[in-house]
Amino acid sequence: MKEITTLEELNKFREEHANVLVDFWAPWCGPCKMVIPLLEGLQEEMTDIAFCKVNIDEAADVATHFGIRNIPTLMHFPNKEDVSGKTQIGFVSKPKLIKWLTS
């Protein structure tokens, strides 16, 4: 999963990929650590989605830009025209995450 450290980097990543999932996380966050292997597995299965992650401790400005207040927070941008994305906060099971991503 690509590590994003700046807003410019995230914007470029979104320009390069039509369907993007962003994982806002922190290394000290227990639920965030539970989400990582789940997302890594989904990345292998759902190849139409480009996965990236933002460490909120290292890229606080990116988190602030998107109004991230809780972690883990996942933002899904299913197309390039979607500027706000849809948000999933907290840990969810794989079936619920797949349903969220495909709905």
Predicted regions and their residues:
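Structural micro-motif
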Residues: 60, 66-77
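Thiol-based oxidoreductase modules, predominantly thioredoxin-like and allied folds used
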Residues: 4-6, 24, 36-61
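Short, thiol/selenol-centered motifs that function as redox-active sites or metal-ligating centers
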Residues: 28-35
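Short pre-active-site segment immediately N-terminal to redox-active cysteine/selenocysteine motifs
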Residues: 18, 25-28, 70
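Structural cue for short, hydrophobic secondary-structure segments
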Residues: 23-25, 76
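Non-catalytic, surface beta->alpha helical segment in thiol-disulfide oxidoreductase systems
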Residues: 76-103
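A short beta-strand-turn-helix
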Residues: 2-20, 60
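CheY-like receiver
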Residues: 12-13, 62-65, 100
